[in-house]
Amino acid sequence: AFFYNAIFFTYALILTDFYGVASGHVGWYILPFAIGNFLGPLLLGRLFDTRGRRPMIAFTYIVSGILLALTGWLFLRNLIDETTQTVCWMVIFFFGSAAAGSAYLTVSETFPLEIRALAIAFFYAVGTGVGGIVAPWLFGVLIDTGSRMSVFAGYLTAAILMVLAGCVAWRWGVDAERKPLESIAKPLTFLD
């Protein structure tokens, strides 16, 4: 949530403050961003069941983080414009939205049936609460400095968090693909 909210809720500020895009034209840049968010889960989703959840979650988180760090570096060096920045975000969130969506579902699969919905709600609320409050505020402060270096530091922090999350998923993730959920987490009412 930190990664997504940091970028999405401050994207308009990046476009207007650093690239001089008129505020009335920002929506045209957000549309491709939204397309990447939609296509990622749509096209990668089935691979989480065929290739495996754990490797795919790790892959999508790590790729998102690496691409964010690279895009941040290009932004820092002023090597991209508003169009290439948008293409970069589209590609990053193609992978990132698939990662985030699958992670919530995988977390829920490790809990017994009776509390599965509660687990999803809890992890979503905590992730969105922390990421939805802290990330836009922090990136708003960084953008307000007018310094590309400050914004890059924020991007790099988010990138590191994504790569670390991918490593955690690889190490401790659950291989839940093609298995009945009850074999992963027995129902609380299960009798031996």
Segments predicted by a language model, with ranges:
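Interfacial helix-cap and linker-helix signal at transmembrane-aqueous boundaries
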Residues: 15-16, 47-48, 138-147
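A late C-terminal transmembrane helix in Major Facilitator Superfamily
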Residues: 108, 113-145
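C-terminal ends and interior cores of transmembrane alpha-helices
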Residues: 63-79
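A membrane-interface helix-boundary motif in multi-pass transporters
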Residues: 141-160
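Extracytoplasmic gate region of multi-pass secondary transporters
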Residues: 1-41, 132-136
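Multi-pass alpha-helical transporter architecture, strongest
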Residues: 106, 159-191
